[in-house]
Structures are given as C-alpha cells and as structure tokens.
C-alpha cells in the first residue's frame, strides 16, 4: 500500500488531473484534506467522475477559493492539525494538497510542514508559465530541506527544451508529461493511466520517467 501526496508549485497547475490519472493507474483511493471553494464541483467530484476512484470525505470544506488559512478565517473555522488525519484504508491512497507546498494551512503552519511528518511519498506538479521554473526550483529546494521522499515530477505544458533543462537542473525524474488537451475526459485519463501504470508496475520502487501525449494514441 502506497500513500502519495500530490503537490503543486502553485494553485491551478494540474494536481487534480494528475491525481485522477494516478488513482486510475494504481487503482487507488483519493483524499483531499481541505477543499477551499467550488464545493458543488469539488476536486473529489472531479476525480471520481474521471477515474471512478473512491474519494474519502474532506476534513474541511471551505467556501472561498483561497489558501486554507484565509478561507477558514472567512468561514469562522479553525483548522486543527489533529483533525487532518489520513483515512484508514488498505488500498493505495492519493492525497491532493490545496495550492502550493508552502501555502499557509493553519493559522500558524505552512502546508508543507503540516504534511512533511507523514509517512508518504511525494510527486510535484509543475505547469509552464512565466516564472514557473523559479517556482519549481524553490519548491524542490523547500521539499528537499525537509528530507521528503520525492518520487519525481509531472510537467504540464513545457516545451521540450525547458523540460530537459528542468530534468538536468533539478535532478528529479519526469514521471509524466501532460499535454494541452482540448477537453479532459475519462478516455484521456484512462489513456494516460495505462501509460503510467505500465512503467509503475515494471518498477516496484515507483514511476521512473514516463512521458508522452496519450491523446495522440487514441486511434
């Protein structure tokens, strides 16, 4: 049984899609500890719809799409670390964080510090935008300073030369490359999952560098 935390260099970089792919690939369950905003179409709903994975209830459901500590303040809720407990399961578990690694979680603690003591592996999601290389390097540095087990990185929308540069500079394996899809469907998720699953099952230590554009293989 593996517990894998999916974290991003920022918010909106593709963590939920990566979570859905891995949940499908590893036949894993899914848990979002804190859902901030979009309660009617939560990340748990999206992951379940795309992958069919069982999604555990969130520890906190907050109304505003803000960092957890701010959304909790607006809702007059106090986020307590003692209430953020990974669900008990014998299945693989994908855990998706809210926002970036160093986003404020409680009123006093950053998200990375809240989860760094957990017995989990980590996957970092990086999306290409102006400043993303800097954000990626800073996030990796922060994760390594906490001695986390980083399985690798998923890159989203990077040109090939920048993807290569990241690999050489950061020295993390590229687990997968997300292409710019017109629409994210169950078929797209399934296609990515099959590619990633093949590599994962061939290496008991985890995914080691699979990339590609599954949508090109649908025919």
UniProtKB/Swiss-Prot annotation:
<feature type="binding site">
    <location>
        <begin position="12"/>
        <end position="17"/>
    </location>
    <ligand>
        <name>ATP</name>
    </ligand>
</feature>
<keyword id="KW-0963">Cytoplasm</keyword>
<dbReference type="GO" id="GO:0000287">
    <property type="term" value="F:magnesium ion binding"/>
</dbReference>
<feature type="active site">
    <location>
        <position position="32"/>
    </location>
</feature>
<feature type="binding site">
    <location>
        <position position="96"/>
    </location>
    <ligand>
        <name>Mg(2+)</name>
    </ligand>
</feature>
<dbReference type="GO" id="GO:0005829">
    <property type="term" value="C:cytosol"/>
</dbReference>
<feature type="binding site">
    <location>
        <position position="43"/>
    </location>
    <ligand>
        <name>ATP</name>
    </ligand>
</feature>
<protein>
    <recommendedName>
        <fullName>ATP-dependent dethiobiotin synthetase BioD</fullName>
        <ecNumber>6.3.3.3</ecNumber>
    </recommendedName>
</protein>
<dbReference type="InterPro" id="IPR004472">
    <property type="entry name" value="DTB_synth_BioD"/>
</dbReference>
<keyword id="KW-0547">Nucleotide-binding</keyword>
<keyword id="KW-0460">Magnesium</keyword>
<dbReference type="InterPro" id="IPR027417">
    <property type="entry name" value="P-loop_NTPase"/>
</dbReference>
<keyword id="KW-0067">ATP-binding</keyword>
<feature type="binding site">
    <location>
        <position position="43"/>
    </location>
    <ligand>
        <name>Mg(2+)</name>
    </ligand>
</feature>
<comment type="pathway">
    <text>Cofactor biosynthesis; biotin biosynthesis; biotin from 7,8-diaminononanoate: step 1/2.</text>
</comment>
<feature type="binding site">
    <location>
        <position position="16"/>
    </location>
    <ligand>
        <name>Mg(2+)</name>
    </ligand>
</feature>
<comment type="function">
    <text>Catalyzes a mechanistically unusual reaction, the ATP-dependent insertion of CO2 between the N7 and N8 nitrogen atoms of 7,8-diaminopelargonic acid (DAPA, also called 7,8-diammoniononanoate) to form a ureido ring.</text>
</comment>
<dbReference type="GO" id="GO:0009102">
    <property type="term" value="P:biotin biosynthetic process"/>
</dbReference>
<dbReference type="GO" id="GO:0005524">
    <property type="term" value="F:ATP binding"/>
</dbReference>
<feature type="binding site">
    <location>
        <begin position="96"/>
        <end position="99"/>
    </location>
    <ligand>
        <name>ATP</name>
    </ligand>
</feature>
<comment type="subunit">
    <text>Homodimer.</text>
</comment>
<keyword id="KW-0093">Biotin biosynthesis</keyword>
<keyword id="KW-0436">Ligase</keyword>
<dbReference type="GO" id="GO:0004141">
    <property type="term" value="F:dethiobiotin synthase activity"/>
</dbReference>
<comment type="similarity">
    <text>Belongs to the dethiobiotin synthetase family.</text>
</comment>
<keyword id="KW-0479">Metal-binding</keyword>
<dbReference type="Pfam" id="PF13500">
    <property type="entry name" value="AAA_26"/>
</dbReference>
């Amino acid at each position: 049984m593996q517990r894998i935390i999916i974290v991003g260099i920022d918010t909106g970089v593709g963590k939920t899609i990566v979570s859905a792919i891995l949940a499908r690939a590893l036949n894993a369950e899914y848990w979002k500890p804190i859902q901030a905003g979009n309660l009617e179409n939560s990340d748990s709903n999206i992951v379940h719809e795309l992958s069919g994975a069982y999604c555990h209830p969130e520890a906190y459901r907050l109304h505003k799409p803000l960092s957890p500590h701010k959304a909790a303040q607006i809702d007059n809720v106090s986020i307590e670390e003692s209430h953020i407990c990974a669900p008990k399961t014998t299945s693989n578990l994908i855990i998706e964080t809210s926002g970036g690694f160093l986003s404020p979680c409680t009123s006093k603690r950053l998200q990375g510090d809240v989860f760094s003591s957990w017995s989990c592996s980590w996957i970092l999601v990086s999306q290409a935008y102006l400043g993303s290389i800097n954000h990626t390097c800073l996030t990796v540095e922060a994760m390594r300073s906490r001695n986390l087990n980083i399985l690798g990185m998923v890159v989203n929308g990077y040109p090939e030369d920048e993807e290569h540069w990241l690999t050489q500079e950061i020295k993390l394996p590229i687990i997968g490359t997300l292409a710019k899809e017109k629409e994210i469907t169950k078929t797209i998720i399934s296609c990515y999952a099959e590619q990633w699953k093949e590599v994962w099952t061939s290496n008991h230590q985890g995914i080691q560098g699979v990339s590609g554009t599954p949508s090109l293989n649908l025919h």
